[in-house]
């Protein structure tokens, strides 16, 4: 479960600023200060590509099509750059993966990356909870302080009218109470199929909260291109109807020209395979 921290993680910057909602909830503000750094982007594109298809699997999967590696990824695995709903699926997948990186490499959770490789239709979003992350106090012994974090991510990287994406993430997070059991099973099955048996068994810890209690943290994240980041709009977010209201974390991540970054990362992920 120990992974090297990818270089692009250094582009996460805690602004030290926050916004307080009318309910008194704190919204933390982070910035993603990406740069045109060839080596960092190259490493990031490989990290990103592995979510959809491991490099050692591509040749086997593309063989019957007669596609190059890039063609297989672009035509079969990745959301389409132009054909709807491909662009919105791209921004959604990208955002979920970026939030996964935040949880794993900044907050030190274990985040299984099983959500995208099993997609049947590249242009469609995967059903279930967006990001599930796990923290064990002691892997040898269960404690009530073991934590399951379930985060929902919503993005707006284009357009001119600011949308209430943080509220959308909160509203979607409400549904996670219903989706949790099935999403845990989906992760466990994919780990099992990948022969990661010990990792799959770790999911057992969180499948029976009545008999084996643990902490559950909810999270709602809005990701914006910086020109669409509006503090007044996000301050309108409310969580009073959320079943985990006392344990929900609110976060905004914004960065410059994010949609072009999304497309560039997908291009690199295909071309550099």
Language model regions located:
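Charged, structured surface patches that assemble and position nucleic-acid processing machinery
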Residues: 201-273
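A short, highly charged nucleic-acid-interacting micro-segment common to nuclease
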Residues: 78-100, 120-122
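Conserved catalytic cores of phosphodiester-cleaving nucleases, focusing on short active-site segments
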Residues: 103, 131-133, 149-155
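Charged, often glycine-rich, active-site loop that binds/positions anionic groups
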Residues: 76, 123-133
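Acidic, metal/cofactor-coordinating or nucleic-acid-engaging core segments within structured domains
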Residues: 159-229
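A short acidic/basic microdomain associated with nuclease active sites
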Residues: 106-124
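Active-site beta-strand-loop-beta-strand hairpin of nuclease catalytic cores
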Residues: 134-150
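Nuclease-adjacent, charged terminal/linker segments that flank catalytic cores
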Residues: 1-68, 77, 267-273
């Amino acid at each position: 479960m120990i992974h090297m921290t990818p270089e692009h993680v250094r582009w996460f910057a805690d602004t030290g600023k926050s916004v307080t909602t009318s309910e008194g909830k704190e919204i933390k503000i982070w910035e993603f200060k990406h740069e045109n750094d060839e080596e960092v982007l190259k490493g990031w594109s490989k990290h990103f590509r592995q979510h959809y298809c491991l490099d050692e699997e591509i040749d086997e999967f593309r063989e019957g099509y007669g596609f190059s590696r890039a063609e297989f990824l672009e035509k079969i695995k990745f959301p389409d750059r132009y054909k709807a709903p491909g662009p919105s699926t791209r921004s959604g997948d990208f955002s979920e993966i970026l939030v996964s990186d935040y949880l794993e490499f900044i907050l030190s959770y274990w985040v299984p990356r099983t959500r995208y490789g099993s997609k049947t239709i590249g242009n469609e979003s995967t059903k279930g909870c967006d990001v599930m992350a796990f923290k064990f106090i002691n892997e040898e012994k269960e404690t009530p302080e073991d934590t399951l974090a379930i985060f929902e991510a919503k993005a707006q990287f284009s357009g001119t009218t600011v949308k209430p994406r943080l509220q959308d993430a909160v509203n979607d997070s409400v549904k996670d109470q219903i989706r949790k059991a099935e999403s845990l099973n989906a992760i466990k099955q994919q780990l099992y199929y990948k022969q990661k048996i010990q990792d799959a068994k770790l999911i057992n810890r969180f499948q029976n909260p009545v008999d084996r209690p643990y902490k559950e943290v909810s999270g709602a994240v809005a990701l914006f291109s910086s020109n669409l980041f509006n503090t007044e709009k996000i301050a309108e977010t409310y969580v009073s109807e959320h079943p985990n209201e006392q344990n929900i974390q609110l976060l905004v991540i914004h960065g410059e020209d994010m949609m072009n970054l999304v497309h560039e990362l997908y291009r690199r992920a295909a071309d550099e395979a």
